[in-house]
Amino acid sequence: MTSILTNIAAMAALQTLRTIGSNMEETQAHVSSGLRVGQAADNAAYWSIATTMRSDNMALSAVQDALGLGAAKVDTAYSGMESAIEVVKEIKAKLVAATEDGVDKAKIQEEIDQLKDQLTSIAEAASFSGENWLQADLSGGPVTKSVVGSFVRDAGGAVSVKKVDYSLNTNSVLFDTAGNTGILDKVYNVSQASVTLPVNVNGTTSEYTVGAYNVDDLIDASATFDGDYANVGAGALAGDYVKVQGSWVKAVDVAATGQEVVYDDGTTKWGVDTTVTGAPATNVAAPASIATIDITIAAQAGNLDALIAGVDEALTDMTSAAADLGSIAMRIDLQSDFVNKLSDSIDSGVGRLVDADMNEESTRLKALQTQQQLAIQSLSIANSASENVLTLFR
């Protein structure tokens, strides 16, 4: 039936043309944006996942920047520690040279002073972005420095920032700005007090050098005696005793003229009365602190071996600290590589969810353009039908 009021063919062609136009707009949006899910209306689930993962990826980008900053801090501290180790090696060499008879210790001390100033300069300059890991205030105990390591979202959706920690303590900083507990300003107890006793047994005199208890460490007379030396007590029964073959024998200080020497090899015990033929010779090593080394002082000049031992212990601590910094640097490098790969993986995963396949979209767009042309032709034909009706009235 032909109607002049309703052109059903034209209406159908127009509806087809509208549908094709809508599909073309969608396809053109995909082509222009590169996304097949550009908004929640396209696919709510995929859009939600992609939005969350993009947010996490931005956080990982910030972590990457923080790792770069942390690596710079660690590298600065390591370079400073490495330079300080070389300087301390020079100080050790100067002390060894000072042991030679006839050398001018004052001249050597001048060189040591310059090296000590260089150590201070290194510690003060080893700072990056206001952070100095070679000197710190340790009055409140160890100080923990942290470097952002990663951004984590667990299975429950909770997020957290993981950190890489490094402790600034007496074995890792060169100087304690609030005291004397850093590697270079603390005192190394390299030698304990000793007493040399000349012992006369039946006319034969021998000398024995032994370590002794400190004056404030008294041995209880009822305690088991295992070879340590006892000091004189106080009171009516002044003195400490050791048991020899079932009998208690009084043990007295080295300042007294008589000594009780006890021998115990596990199976045999015996005691010998001795007589000190002269004042016992004592030896107390001078404290060894690199920051206070001054071999022009008699007490230190006479204990160069102790000073060298102290410097060697400081070198051991510095080497250990440098190794720790190297380990932290390696961990940061590994973490940085991992964060890069993780970020790439997230980008790839998000792309699979929301990116448009440009080959598919371009092919679809070409097909829709062809369909649009055909729909226009169809609409044109449908509209011309009314003109055919007019010819009937001519």
From Swiss-Prot:
GO molecular function, one term: structural molecule activity
A GO-annotated cellular component: bacterial-type flagellum
Source taxon at top rank: Bacteria
Name of the protein described by the UniProt record: Flagellin B
Task performed by this protein: Flagellin is the subunit protein which polymerizes to form the filaments of bacterial flagella.
The organism of origin for this protein: Rhizobium meliloti (strain 1021) (Ensifer meliloti)
Gene3D superfamilies for this protein: f41 fragment of flagellin, N-terminal domain
Keyword Secreted: yes
Gene: flaB
UniProt keyword Transferase, yes or no: no
Subcellular location as annotated: Secreted; Bacterial flagellum
Keywords: Bacterial flagellum, Secreted
